[in-house]
Structures are given as structure tokens and as C-alpha cells.
Design a protein with these regions (language model features):
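Interface amphipathic segments
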Residues: 1-300
């Protein structure tokens, strides 16, 4: 719907996006008057866990000085509330400036009590321009849910650290160092994770070099790639396991076995599309599981 009252132009767009676990309703409203545009985006889902919220901003457009003036936009982000997985978060006031092919982000701040995401820096095609993202106790599950990466793999854990990005509009260079407390894969807790990650432009994936510290004095080591972009979404990881909790395997064996308990030590290759992951290697285990067809527990 687009309207043109006497003193401004207004537009409204509403749509519904169907997902595997429910629908997401979106509405976008904008009003333009003179050199300003006010925009409000509302969204909400109808799944068991609530994801909803509002993003509101006012953009002012200016012309730069010089013989060939360019359009400059100053966007003021207004304070609003967002619900992530039934938890209330706050978007704080900040400013984004778009000028001559550059985007300056000035203290974008998103928080829930002492958990937060803070973004500062410049986006451009210049390698010298960098954006810094600070994270404190951000649940990795939120990222996978919002990005809708896959319903067949679930990463959890509270991530703290810093990520950097440069040359974003040309050939992105992105890297991060994170500490993830109580890292888990498909409801199987693996331990505390220290990880270095970097975006690989050629492979269109994230290179990982990580260590997982749990009960063993020696950490488990994970090196490889995660491919978050569809349709190639999947992973290719080499794992040097030291008494690694095997609970995460229950998700992939649920058609034949359940109640998997125990730990494994050895070298394995964990790879494939998220919908059909494979696990190869040699592992010494001290574990048990229940085979449904026999209704019996076995030790392995």
C-alpha cells in the first residue's frame, strides 16, 4: 500500500514467510517528508519459541559539497525491544552514516542485561577500513536460528570475543577469536571452546581452528571448514578427540539407538551436508547405548 497525503508519502508492506517450524510475519512501514524517511520494521513468528521485535530508524539525506555532489544518508537508529527465544533484548540508540561508498557504524549496541553485541567501524571496499564486533555471552543458537542455517544441526554455548571485517564490499576479509562456554552440538555438551575462525572467499566457508577443554587434561582439537551458505551448507572437520562426550551422536543415531553415554578418544573425520553428516575414523570408547529394536543397553 502506497499513499500520498498532502505533506508526505507513506508506504506499507506486509508479508508472511513460511518456515519449517512455523511462519514469520513481517511488516514494513515508511514515511517520507522533505529530506527525511522514517522506517519501522516489525516481525514475529508463531513457533514455540518467540522471535519478534521492532527496528525503527530515521534517515536524513544530504548532498555533499563539490563539483559532483553525492547523496549522503545519516541514519539514526531508535531504541526498541526485540524478543529472541522468549528473552527480551534492547536495541540502543546509534547512528549509521552512508557516504561515498562507505558505511560508518557508530556504536550499534544490542543487549540483554550484561550480554551484548557492539559494532563500530567502517564498511567499504578499502582493506584499511575495518568493522569491529564485540560479543559478550551471546548464545550461538540465536545466530543459527535467526540465520536459518539448518534444522539438522544445533550449536549452543555462550560466545565472548571479537570479530573483525574489512574489504566487505569487494573481497571480504573476516576473522574472529572466541571463547564459547559450555559449547554443545545437538544437545550434547562437549566442553569449553576456544576458536579462531576466518572467512575463506574461495571456499565460501569459515575456516576453524579450535580446542575443546573438558575433563581430559589434553584438549580435543578441531580443524576444518563450516559452510553456512545454502545449498552447500555443511561441514568438513578433522577432530583429534580426547575423552570427548559422545552424547552428540544420539541425534544422528536416533532411528536405531538412544540414551548414548560415554566418551571417546581418537582421530575422526566429521563431514557432509547438515542433512546427512558422516563420521569416519578410529576411536577408543568407554560408552553405552540403548538399541530400540532390542530394548537393550549395550556397552561398547
Amino acid at each position: 500500500l502506497c499513499e500520498n497525503p498532502s505533506d508526505h508519502i507513506s508506504a506499507k508492506v506486509r508479508l508472511t514467510s513460511l518456515k519449517k517450524n512455523g511462519a514469520v510475519n513481517l511488516s514494513l512501514e515508511a514515511q517520507a517528508k522533505e529530506d527525511k524517511v522514517s522506517t519501522t520494521l516489525n516481525w514475529g513468528n508463531n513457533a514455540i519459541a518467540t522471535y519478534s521485535g521492532k527496528l525503527a530508524a530515521v534517515a536524513q539525506f544530504l548532498r555533499t559539497a563539490g563539483e559532483k555532489p553525492l547523496l549522503k544518508a545519516m541514519v539514526d537508529v531508535n531504541p526498541t525491544d526485540v524478543i529472541l527465544n522468549d528473552t527480551l533484548w534492547k536495541i540502543h540508540p546509534s547512528q549509521v552514516v552512508v557516504d561515498s561508498g562507505r558505511v560508518d557504524v557508530n556504536n550499534f549496541y544490542f543487549s540483554h542485561h550484561d550480554r551484548y553485541v557492539r559494532i563500530n567501524g567502517r564498511l567499504s571496499d578499502n582493506p584499511a577500513d575495518t568493522v569491529k564486533v564485540d560479543l559478550k555471552d551471546i548464545n550461538m543458537g540465536y545466530v543459527f536460528d535467526i540465520a536459518n542455517i539448518s534444522d539438522d544441526v544445533n550449536f549452543e554455548g555462550d560466545a565472548t570475543g571479537t570479530a573483525y571485517a574489512s574489504s566487505v564490499f569487494k573481497k571480504p576479509v573476516m576473522n574472529t577469536r572466541l571463547f564459547v562456554k559450555n559449547f554443545s552440538l545437538n544437545q550434547g555438551r562437549l566442553g569449553d571452546l576456544n576458536v579462531y575462525g576466518a572467512w575463506d572467499n574461495e571456499k565460501r566457508g569459515i575456516y576453524l581452528d579450535a580446542s575443546i577443554q573438558d575433563i581430559s587434561p589434553s584438549p580435543s582439537r578441531v580443524i576444518g571448514m563450516i559452510y553456512p551458505l545454502k545449498p552447500e551448507s555443511g561441514l568438513d572437520l578433522n577432530i583429534d578427540a580426547h575423552e570427548l562426550n559422545l552424547k552428540f551422536l544420539e541425534f544422528y543415531m536416533k532411528s536405531i539407538a538412544q540414551d548414548i553415554k560415554g566418551r571417546g578418544t581418537g582421530k575422526v573425520h566429521f563431514y557432509g551436508k547438515f542433512k546427512g553428516l558422516n563420521l569416519d575414523g578410529a576411536v577408543m570408547t568407554d560408552a553405552s547405548m540403548k538399541f530400540d529394536i532390542l530394548n537393550t543397553h549395550f556397552a561398547v
